[in-house]
Amino acid sequence: MAATDLERFSNAEPEPRSLSLGGHVGFDSLPDQLVSKSVTQGFSFNILCVGETGIGKSTLMNTLFNTTFETEEASHHEACVRLRPQTYDLQESNVQLKLTIVDAVGFGDQINKDESYRPIVDYIDAQFENYLQEELKIRRSLFDYHDTRIHVCLYFITPTGHSLKSLDLVTMKKLDSKVNIIPIIAKADTISKSELHKFKIKIMGELVSNGVQIYQFPTDDEAVAEINAVMNAHLPFAVVGSTEEVKVGNKLVRARQYPWGVVQVENENHCDFVKLREMLIRVNMEDLREQTHSRHYELYRRCKLEEMGFQDSDGDSQPFSLQETYEAKRKEFLSELQRKEEEMRQMFVNKVKETELELKEKERELHEKFEHLKRVHQEEKRKVEEKRRELEEETNAFNRRKAAVEALQSQALHATSQQPLRKDKDKKNRSDIGAHQPGMSLSSSKVMMTKASVEPLNCSSWWPAIQCCSCLVRDATWREGFL
């Protein structure tokens, strides 16, 4: 019990004591110092404009800051929503403002609008992530860092006079936890005052019924509580934008000229432009910056740190130190890393085994195919060798026959060349015999006929020539034997 009390008293903070000063110290100049430092450093303010193409976003920005921003003409044929940021350096008196206007180009122009809000949400989260990464650096320089976090979203509502579109409700519901939303009815001069009043009531009722949280001007500061409470009742603001100057009476005012009359931008009886400018720039700009940092960014930061495993205390409400959390997460990540490495190693081993089996199977198939081709090749080679031997045998036989035929032809020609001499000799002998033996004339004529029947033949091809020459040889042999 005593230990518990001691621990309780040791952890309790002492009550501050109020003391009076004996003279002037000087810390009453702290506000002046802060103002001087802020003026030297300058301010940044980032506005996100969401609305359909051609609804008047660029015109309203030019009217709000009383200048002309150079912007590209938007197209109605964008394939998807595209965020286009443009940064400008403005100066009023001795105050510098780095103004960034982010336009949601192509919003609402697609046939399928289910994911039209996604690029906007991703852009806002990306700016939060950039700031978080800068904060987590060991050597951070937030003083020189250009803060691109969105401070306010001006949501432009089409003046239909009936109700909000489903796209508007879904988009604002997705954005209300990430950015300060101020709904605006654009081109309010296109509907009558009675319709505009009913339209405002209808919009606020739909926002409340669907749980959409828009930015409420703060009423906790006594200096602005009254005016902010009045302006909260005028939401959403019905505005008209114009950069043209029209002469009304004896002065030039920004207005829109119509055949039926003139709509003055800064006339509160015509539209809520002045109310919007007062609430957005002159009264609540710093509160919008503070709400972005302390509410929306802190929510994003907390979610990110919880995803990383950081928390303020355990289940017993014991505070965790950053070192303990880091060590715990480090051990957890190392064990997870080892488990993943083991799984990957096992997967690699299994994959290697499967690959080896596949390679062995492929190798076996290739060997079988090679052996088959080898056998086919050997069989073809054997057949070719047999054909070659048969051809050589036929060639040799042909050469032998050719040589024999040539020899026989030469003999036949030689024998034929001896025939005239024999004829003369035989003629002479027959004449002698005829003179002595007259009965031999018939047989002599037969012999001459036999000789005449064995003349050489002319053959056109070699095989018939061989046959004919063979017959000739036989006839010649018979004739020689006969003679």
Swiss-Prot record:
Transmembrane segments in this chain: where?
A: none
| Family matches, as SUPFAM superfamilies | P-loop containing nucleoside triphosphate hydrolases
Q: What is this protein called?
A: Septin-8
Residues where GTP binds: 51-58, 106, 187-195, 241, 256
The taxonomy runs: Eukaryota, Metazoa, Chordata, Craniata, Vertebrata
Q: Which residues carry this modification: Phosphoserine?
A: S10
Any one GO cellular component localisation term in the record: cell division site
Q: Where is this region: G1 motif?
A: 51-58
> Which Pfam families does the record match to this protein?
Septin (PF00735)
Q: One MF term from GO for this chain?
A: GTP binding
Its localization reads:
Cytoplasm; Cytoplasm, Cytoskeleton; Synapse; Cell projection, Axon
Which tissues express it? Widely expressed, including in brain, heart and platelets; most abundant in aorta. Isoform 2 is expressed at low levels in specific brain areas, such as occipital pole, frontal lobe, temporal lobe and putamen. Isoform 1 and 3 are highly expressed in specific brain areas, such as occipital pole, frontal lobe, temporal lobe and putamen. Isoform 2 is highly expressed in prostate, testis and ovary. Isoform 1 and isoform 3 are expressed at low levels in prostate, testis and ovary.
Which spans does this entry mark as compositional bias, Basic and acidic residues? 1-16, 421-433
- Region G4 motif: start and end of each range? 186-189
Q: How does it assemble?
A: Septins polymerize into heterooligomeric protein complexes that form filaments, and can associate with cellular membranes, actin filaments and microtubules. GTPase activity is required for filament formation. Interacts with CDK14. Interacts with SEPTIN5. Interacts with SEPTIN7. Interacts with SEPTIN4. Interacts with VAMP2; the interaction inhibits interaction of VAMP2 with SYP. Interacts with STX1A.
